[in-house]
């Protein structure tokens, strides 16, 4: 008996540390095994968010008023004392045996108590196929960056599936309504239905389980998720389907929006909040959401988002009140989180909702703020008396490219303090359409709430670079100052959405500029400066070999330099064609194609820049070959045609989510450009009809010119249906490849 008791006691002693462990212990252990023993973590009550760095003997003390702020303090210490930068490209590090001491206590406070993360688009453009391992890293990243209020939209297709089954909808009806994995974001935003599906049952069970894990970890950290709410979405065939199923919801055409298109896709219907059936639907939605995922303090709803199908004479005040009332019925303490985007929020919403019941996300604060700073979306009264968050959008379509508005971001952030609306500024947010790019911009944004005094980008970049690489180097600093001054400093006069898009990813023409339809791109930096920065990085690459952050940045900066050089060569090639300079034309277009293949070769060295990482993530979520094929098709379509022929061409969605990645460069973009240049070559050689560029008979020119009648979609679709596997991990000697590629691209 005594032996049994001793054994039980010994077992409990072994298990006790895991029972007593805090989420901070788990975070530190995931960063580096044994790291939790190197810190003293102290939680102190405070009415204001803060973290402190201190020293006690040989151990570093990190103090804060909650786990998230303590994690933010750990991140600050790692960057500015230990020279360790945890980033999307590297969330693990080897800490020194003895941590560098904090010689003087350092304290940071913020009045921005809410720090938001994500855009609905992020859940499809970046996170569509993430598993728990990747989500665990992201939640750690959020905590380290002070995020305490993220959108948590995983698994909401499960809520809708259950609602429709309760209402008696058939499996086909459900499949026709709910979108596939790579397109769920736009279904949730009421833009399309069914595209990318049907989802197998295993998808729903996986997503439900994944969301529950995500929410559990967030709760451990004290992170409060923003869950999707209900604002009236119903299937576009709602009236017909309601007549076919057995339920007590009456049909009335007057309160259903007319069927509209979104870039060629049929939008779901909108059950107007003034309709009595709205309450029945919203009740079911919140019941099912709470049953699956629990009650939330915040719900995200964007009624009439990019919508033109609002019935004339609709009482918008009543609509907004009904949406808010439905949420409050589910949780009287809940707050509505709404995006400030385009025409939203409408004046009727500002008037209808009581201050304190809604939080607006100023989605594009660094470029198009609504709170008073000069912009095309400026509102004289901002968000009136409502609370709001200053947000960084930064990325569209998860496109690849160096980009930022450093001066504008810093200026706009500190400018808010001088506006009357600042009294209602309660938070900040990251609202990118796609993540895992330009880590420097998100690091800057997440530090702003913790820095009282305004600073210059030059001084901040100097500290960032030293922290990111764990060492100071004159040439590396010079490279980053060039980038900060040029490509990372898009000016206020420029209204473009996201990075300077790679010419490689454009559908070929004689007037290519941007790859996607709506980027509003315009030149704002000297394109030769990225090569200058790349040259400096390459010159010290041997010194930093094996440094994960440096190697990622080396590839990214050189990638940008090659893309910029290719644009210069493209312009030369077009000029050659227009002047019928056969010799130079052939030489220049071959140089363009050579640069494209060099880019493909370079990007093969890093997993983050390989299309196989994306397609393999998709396939790994499948439990059968049919599921793997469906998910791979979703992944391939999203980054190329986006939709069917009509949506890609007439709807202009093609290449919106283009990716400058290894694999797709060689197998998708190269054939497009090779085809185009060869057609022009036939014209310049007199083997095909051509009319002078700028001929007055433009209609005839378009009809007769084979370069303008290429069926691009017919070339593109086969790649989306293909199943040729791509490698997901980086291959080869990165530093040697970078040096070789730079020499081949720039000749010195």
Please provide the spans of the model-predicted regions.
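Positively charged n-region of N-terminal signal peptides that target proteins for export
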Residues: 1-4
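Bacterial N-terminal signal peptides
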Residues: 7-17
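Contiguous, structured surface segment used for ligand recognition
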Residues: 19-112
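Second-shell loop/turn segments in exported
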Residues: 59-64, 124-128, 201-202, 272
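Catalytic-core regions of glycoside hydrolase
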Residues: 85, 89-99, 118-122, 143, ...
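Extended, compositionally biased alpha-helical segments that mediate assembly or anchoring
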Residues: 661-748
């Amino acid at each position: 008996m005594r032996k049994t008791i001793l054994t039980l006691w010994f077992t409990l002693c072994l298990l006790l540390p895991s029972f007593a462990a805090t989420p901070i212990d788990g975070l530190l252990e995931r960063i580096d095994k044994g790291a939790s023993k190197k810190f003293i973590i102290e939680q102190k009550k405070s009415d204001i968010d803060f973290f402190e760095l201190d020293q006690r003997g040989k151990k570093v003390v990190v103090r804060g008023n909650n786990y998230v702020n303590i994690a933010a303090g750990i991140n600050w210490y790692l960057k500015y004392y230990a020279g360790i930068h945890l980033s999307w490209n590297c969330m693990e590090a080897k800490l020194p045996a003895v941590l560098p001491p904090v010689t003087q206590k350092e304290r940071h406070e913020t009045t921005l108590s809410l720090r938001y993360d994500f855009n609905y688009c992020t859940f499809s453009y970046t996170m569509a196929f993430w598993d728990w391992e990747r989500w665990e890293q992201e939640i750690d990243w959020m905590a380290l960056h002070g995020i305490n209020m993220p959108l948590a939209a995983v698994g909401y297709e499960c809520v809708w599936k259950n609602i429709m089954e309760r209402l008696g909808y058939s499996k086909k009806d459900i499949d026709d309504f709910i979108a596939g994995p790579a397109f769920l974001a736009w279904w949730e935003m009421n833009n399309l239905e069914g595209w990318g599906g049907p989802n197998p049952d295993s998808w729903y069970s996986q997503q439900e389980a994944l969301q529950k894990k995500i929410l559990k970890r967030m709760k451990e950290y004290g992170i409060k998720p923003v869950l999707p709410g209900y604002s009236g979405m119903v299937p576009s065939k709602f009236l017909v389907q309601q007549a076919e199923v057995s339920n007590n919801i009456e049909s009335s055409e007057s309160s259903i929006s007319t069927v509209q298109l979104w870039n060629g896709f049929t939008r779901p219907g909108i059950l107007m909040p003034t309709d009595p059936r709205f309450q029945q639907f919203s009740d079911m939605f919140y019941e099912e959401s709470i049953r699956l995922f629990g009650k939330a303090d915040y719900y995200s709803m964007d009624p009439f988002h990019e919508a033109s199908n609002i019935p004339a004479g609709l009482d918008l005040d009543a609509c907004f009140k009904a949406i808010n009332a439905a949420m409050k019925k589910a949780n009287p303490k809940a707050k509505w989180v709404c995006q400030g985007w385009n025409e939203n929020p409408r004046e009727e919403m500002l008037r209808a909702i009581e201050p304190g019941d809604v939080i607006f996300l100023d989605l594009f604060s660094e470029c198009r703020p609504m709170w008073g700073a000069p912009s095309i979306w400026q509102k004289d009264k901002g968000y009136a008396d409502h609370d709001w968050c200053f947000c960084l959008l930064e990325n569209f379509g998860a496109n690849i490219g160096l980009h930022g508005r450093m001066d504008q971001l810093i200026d706009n952030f500190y400018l808010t303090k001088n506006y009357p609306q600042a009294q209602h500024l309660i938070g900040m947010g990251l609202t990118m359409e796609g993540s895992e790019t330009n880590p420097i911009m998100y690091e800057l944004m997440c530090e702003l709430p913790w820095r009282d005094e305004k600073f210059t980008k030059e001084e901040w970049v100097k500290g960032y670079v030293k922290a990111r690489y764990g060492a100071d180097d004159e040439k590396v600093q010079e490279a980053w100052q060039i980038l900060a001054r040029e490509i990372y400093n898009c000016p206020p006069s420029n209204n473009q959405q996201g990075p300077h898009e790679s010419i490689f990813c454009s559908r070929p023409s004689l007037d290519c500029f941007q790859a996607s339809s709506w980027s509003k791109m315009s030149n704002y930096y000297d394109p030769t400066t990225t090569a200058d920065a790349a040259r400096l990085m390459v010159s010290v690459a041997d010194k930093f070999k094996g440094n994960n952050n440096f190697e990622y940045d080396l590839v990214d900066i050189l990638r940008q330099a090659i893309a910029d050089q290719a644009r210069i060569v493209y312009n030369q090639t077009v000029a050659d064609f227009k002047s019928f300079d056969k010799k130079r034309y052939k030489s220049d277009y071959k140089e363009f194609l050579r640069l494209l293949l060099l880019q493909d070769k370079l990007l093969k060295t890093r997993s983050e820049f390989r299309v196989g990482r994306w397609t393999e993530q998709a396939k790994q979520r499948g439990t059968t070959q049919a599921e793997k094929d469906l998910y791979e098709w979703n992944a391939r379509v999203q980054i190329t045609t986006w939709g069917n022929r009509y949506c890609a061409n007439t709807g202009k969605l093609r290449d919106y989510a283009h990716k400058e990645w290894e694999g797709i460069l060689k197998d998708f973009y190269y054939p497009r450009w090779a085809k185009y240049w060869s057609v022009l070559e036939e014209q310049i050689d007199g083997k095909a009809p051509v009319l002078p560029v700028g001929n007055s008979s433009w209609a005839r020119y378009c009809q007769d010119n084979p370069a303008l009648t290429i069926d691009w979609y017919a070339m593109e679709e086969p790649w989306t249906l293909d199943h040729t596997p791509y490698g997901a991990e980086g291959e080869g000697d990165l530093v040697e490849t970078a040096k070789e590629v730079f020499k081949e691209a720039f000749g010195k």
